[in-house]
Amino acid sequence: MRGLRRKNINWSELQLFEETVDQRKEEPYRNTASPQTVKKRKFWLAVSVLCNASLLIFFKLSNVFEENMLLPVGISFYTFKSISYLIDVYRSGHAERSFLRFGAYLCCFPQIVSGPIMRYGEMEQAQQFGVWKAARAEDGLKYIIAGLGMKVLLADRLGFLWNDIQTIGFESISTPLAWLGAAAYSMELYFDFAGYSLIAVGIGRMIGLPAIKNFDQPYSSRSVSEFYRRWHMTLGSWFRDYLYIPLGGNRKGTLRTVFNLLLVWAVTGFWHGGGLHFILWGMILGLLVVIEKLWIGKWLKKSKILSHVYVLFVIPLTWMVFAIPTLPEIGVYFARLFPFFGVGSAVNPGDFAKELTLFIPELVGGILLCIPQVYRWCEKHRKNVIVVAALFVVFWYSVYRMANAANNPFMYANF
């Protein structure tokens, strides 16, 4: 994170304020049988959503124009949870009357930093929320340890490789190292976020919440569209249900579909941050999704190998736009990736071998866990004595790493 000067704002009070306001805003459409007109109910829904969205937009833009502004932790996540709750109440006419239970949903501590974005209906269906069971706690602990290992032993270590590249300077790296950096950052972000999601699932299991899947082996995808159906699945489904489909989805012709997709992806970029590079990242993904939908999608389905290569080539490139905050720096990095008009590979030719040697275990481990068969085998056999012993080693080695390393917060906590 940047070096930030903390403002005199109590973020827990902000969250409590948002909960209270949302509880009050439910009243105009709590019961569909009440004698309120549809127009009035829509008005109050719009006011409710606007109040929540305004807070998020304010802090996203403040973080761009005021470098010393510290974002409230998890604001992107609990704001979306709040909006989804309000819309679901509007659609169903059923609201939660208990402020305590609603607060437990909005402030659910395992999910507050980086999600997943749970719907209220999922929590409402959790019949044993708050009920302790030893078997469930044991299963949850395994998820927590697996997530901790992903974060500490893979993501944080691969983050050092990306930090090395930034320290060297994009102008001074060779083309092979530029590609290694793109691959390392892609895996760092994945294991950091997927690791947190597993920890959240594990804690949720312990306290009786449903296991909400947020990742499904995205790097095994055969298109960018499929990749984002498997990556941060709760965010993707949120945009589908509360923005894309209400805009008309793909039901109003090709031009409207293209517009809806581009708008959704632009908003997705802004959700991650108000910086121009986030918006650009979202628009690039939107264009790729449109191109796949209109033209190349049918060709990707014909060749499993070529479609996988396409995803593994394109996705790391988009992550570079996501990771690098200024357009000039993005241009320099891409000039190193594609040295058609410059020295490229001739710059510092020994840097690739040096960095590769330092991070071989993490790169190999990351690649293995990106293979669906390997990951599913580990998940299926998580009660096997060998897997349990491996988790024991992972836990203590992770503790050792954390005790001897600088603090590395979860990357999505910044969003």
Show where each model-derived region lies.
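Membrane-embedded transmembrane alpha-helical bundles that form the catalytic cores
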Residues: 1-366, 370, 376-414
